[in-house]
Regions:
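Short glycine-rich substrate-engagement loop in P-loop NTPases that contacts/grips substrate
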Residues: 20, 82-122
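Conserved AAA+ ATPase core "coupling" helix
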Residues: 163-196, 205
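The conserved phosphate-sensing helix
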Residues: 204, 212-226
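Conserved C-terminal helix/linker of AAA+ ATPases
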Residues: 225-238
């Protein structure tokens, strides 16, 4: 964690360990990406589980991976995003009148420029809540997703509303509620530590209770842990 902001893969919780391992393979560059027609990473699951935050962080983590500054013998889940960020990511908040034409034109514009700015030699595109585009607009994105030098990071709360052609072009990463409340304890402890609250002041059992109440929402979990930290004299990090 960088203050209260996730800055590595291990700052997120995954309901499917196989899916997290896929991301680890990509970030460690053991699994080529894009490869075999898979040009996107689609994060799907319920609200508040960190999908948008992770979608915007993944390009940063890939830049660290391709820069060669991280010792790949160390767990890649701990690999941090570069500080300060130099990554130029084009972010599209789907819905609200955003058209597929606008997205396609932007992708083509980036794809035609030379040289590519990033260490990965790819351009990065985030499509947040892609299911909010109508099905025709989604289908028209299949072609730009096939352009060279492009990586796409998509999120959705409703996987069944995403065009099958887009789904087929993506690695699917499930982000739903983790069934074991104990899995949330390290995250809560990290937040409290960043607030200056001593170890054990808020017990593991209390953190598990907060996790159960949050029902999978990292937004609610983080909020309630912060409130506990403030109640015990902690301060928000600068």
């Amino acid at each position: 964690m960088n203050g209260m902001t996730p800055n590595c893969l291990d700052d997120f919780l995954f309901s499917n360990h196989t899916d997290k391992h896929t991301l680890e393979l990509i970030l460690s560059r053991k699994l080529p990406f894009p490869f075999g027609g898979k040009t996107g990473i689609l994060l799907h699951g319920t609200w508040g589980t960190g999908k948008t935050t992770l979608a915007e962080l993944l390009p940063e983590l890939l830049e660290t991976a391709y820069s060669g500054t991280w010792d790949m013998s160390v767990a890649v889940g701990q690999m941090p995003a570069p500080e300060p960020s130099h990554t130029q990511t084009e972010i599209f908040r789907c819905g609200g009148g955003l058209s597929s034409t606008t997205i396609s034109q932007s992708v083509s514009k980036f794809n035609n420029r030379m040289p590519v700015f990033h260490f990965s030699q790819h351009d990065y595109f985030v499509l947040d809540e892609v299911e909010r585009l109508n099905i025709g607009a989604q289908q028209s994105l299949r072609s730009p997703m096939g352009l060279k030098r492009c990586m796409f990071f998509l999120t959705t709360n409703y996987l069944t509303k995403v065009d099958p052609g887009i789904v087929n072009r993506c690695h699917l990463i499930e982000m739903n509620q983790v069934t074991t409340p104990n899995a949330y304890v390290p995250l809560g402890q990290s937040i409290l530590q960043n607030m200056g609250v001593g170890t054990g002041v808020v017990s593991a059992a209390e953190l598990q209770g907060i996790a159960a109440k949050a029902r999978g929402s990292l937004r609610d979990y983080t909020h309630d842990v912060v409130m506990q930290g403030l109640a015990h004299g902690g301060v928000m990090p600068a």
